[in-house]
Amino acid sequence: MPDPIKFISIDPINGMTQKKPGIVCNLINGEWVTTDNIRKDIVDPMNGEHFLQIPDTTDHSNFINDINLQKSFGTHNPLYKPERYLMLGEVCAKAAALMAKPEVEHYFTKLIQRVMPKEYNQCRGEVIVTRIFLENFSGDGVRFLGRGFSNPGDHQ
């Protein structure tokens, strides 16, 4: 791909083949971890070959231990960490701006199309909708996550 973006780690057009598969990792205790136990039931929709190395994670104890080690009280509370919501809003805005670049939009469109055989414009529509969501959410959307909602129902 011309002018690759720094975060790109796989080429959905010329990569992700049986000879050069895409590799999926588990995130455990802040580290990306691979495993020898790989799923064999996910095949390339274009030719039926195995093109992804996806961990067949059946032992969840590492994830549970990782969660138990994390401090959770106040971490996501907007009353304790208002700067976190500002930062998350900035992340959404920057992601949306990046997705507006034609080469990034094309990359994600081809990436979706590679794992889900759809027409180019269908996959591009998914990228555009996600970008628009991030644009909208980057404003007050993140701040409103800490707000309570009460909606009247039709029950008695």
Give the ranges of each region predicted by the language model.
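Terminal low-complexity tails and localization/encapsulation signals of metabolic enzymes
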Residues: 1-54, 90, 94, 128, ...
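Glycine-rich loop-to-alpha-helix module at the N-terminal edge of alpha/beta enzyme cores
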Residues: 49-154
